[in-house]
């Protein structure tokens, strides 16, 4: 009987009733899986480099890009050179060997990167639970590294930006798996930073993401320098007899203004990422170090501040007190909605032919959306670089920003580690900062009325 029973159970033969039941169950499982993986469309734009988005889109809105989130490495030495492919891959490989970063990427690692002028936010693609949020002023550098078939985008940030130290270091630990902390025990007591590791589907997607971040850095830099210019004008026009100095207001809404200006102290590097001689491409790297502490960064920041001081002192030597007040009034009108064309024409009339070269010094303070019109205006009136120290300095300074897409890594400039101090980064803090600038200029207008009376 047992033998007959065994003979009856032939392998590969399934009862018709069981086949129908299994087919129905598989169909239900497939539909359930499709329901789970159904994803909303992203709030995004498609760029064809070197195309750029409207600055207002980043200031008042946000852009989403799909990435794969590998994880976050903490306690990385602050002296890490973000433009060095070898150094970055050293830490990534070490983390993979210790299972802190995934060796193989799956659908579970899919994430959404949300980018604005205030912060970078990462959330899981399914469920959209927030992984971390990094304020822009906590980002020291952005690098693109090609590792075989993987296209990695790495953010060098302040230690534990936007998350508590107890949170996970990588995608697996965020999903409930255990993971330790990556630390270089051989390194002495140096400031630490973090590396946020992401992957994109292609080189084009990685470069597009880096381009967007580069534009964010430039927008933040422009707003910060305009703030400095407004304060410097207010300082020089309202009290023309005392020595001009740049300062940060002591109020809570105007902190770390010098640190914000430091963003321009370092470089944005965009090396050619094509393969050379069979070697992997160098990283596509952008650096902005709002809180850097190295000597070279400090010197660069001092130099940038001195350029601004020199320009304001030049205005005081070339313009009368009344003309400086007129300049402040024109700037106030421009910041409150006047067109760049009106601003340029009015400044041209104020400066006259003999002083029109002073317009070159305004280059770093013109918002990106108006920069092309400003450059065209300079060409129209015959203003070129090379008219003295001030104009040369500002001319070189502006070109360094405008030609980032073709510059190469020099390998000698490193980024100091950002510290973990807080600074205004959310929308309300940003709005209050801009409002404070307008208030300063309005106060300048009141002092002008009193002087004329």
Curated annotation (Swiss-Prot):
The keyword Cell membrane does not apply. The modification Phosphothreonine is found at residues 403, 408. Highly expressed in heart, lower expression in kidney, lung and liver (at protein level). Residues 59-248 form the PID domain. Residues 401-417 have a biased composition (Polar residues). Residues 22-36 have a biased composition (Basic and acidic residues). Part of a complex with MAP2K3, MAP3K3 and RAC1. Binds RAC1 directly and independently of its nucleotide-bound state. Interacts with PDCD10. Interacts with HEG1 and KRIT1; KRIT1 greatly facilitates the interaction with HEG1. Its main location: cytoplasm. The gene is Ccm2. The modification Phosphoserine is found at residues 15, 164, 393, 402, 405. The C-terminal region constitutes an independently folded domain that has structural similarity with the USH1C (harmonin) N-terminus, despite very low sequence similarity. This is Cerebral cavernous malformations protein 2 homolog. Signal peptide: none annotated. GO terms for cellular component: mitochondrion; protein-containing complex. Keywords: Cytoplasm, Phosphoprotein. GO terms for biological process: blood vessel development; blood vessel endothelial cell differentiation; cell-cell junction organization; endothelial cell development; endothelial tube morphogenesis; endothelium development; heart development; in utero embryonic development.
